[in-house]
Amino acid sequence: MAEANEMASAFEAVLKTGDFGKVQELALTHAADDFVQEWPQSGERLTKAASVRIAEQYSEKSGTSPKFSYKRMLGGGDLFVVEGTIDYGDGIPVSYVGIGELRDGKVTKMTEYFANPFEAPAWRANFVERM
């Protein structure tokens, strides 16, 4: 458990820098050999090797260097959740939630959700508080 706490502290420190590349680098350093990354919104599943290749080529191929804004990280045992926003260079904060699973101090699975902001429907205005 101490190993997981040390890893969580390292992740939190890097997440707070906002440097997306460093976040990816640290994540892959702590990934198990059988690591799987899933992006449900685009229907993609990546192996550790594919994640490494995407991280290496991301800025060049996408034309952007995303910046991460850390909100919080929660978890315990073999599960953790990261919440934040990502700016892909256009100034639009994309909401991010990542759910990580651990085994023997290594990340075995990371499921990540990305959501662009959208205007709430007018019919809900009487039921909600605007943030």
Predicted regions, residues:
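Short, flexible micro-motifs
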Residues: 21, 46, 108
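A beta-strand edge to alpha-helix "cap/lid" segment located at domain peripheries
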Residues: 3, 53-131
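A solvent-exposed, acidic/Ser-Thr-rich amphipathic alpha-helical stretch
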Residues: 24-76
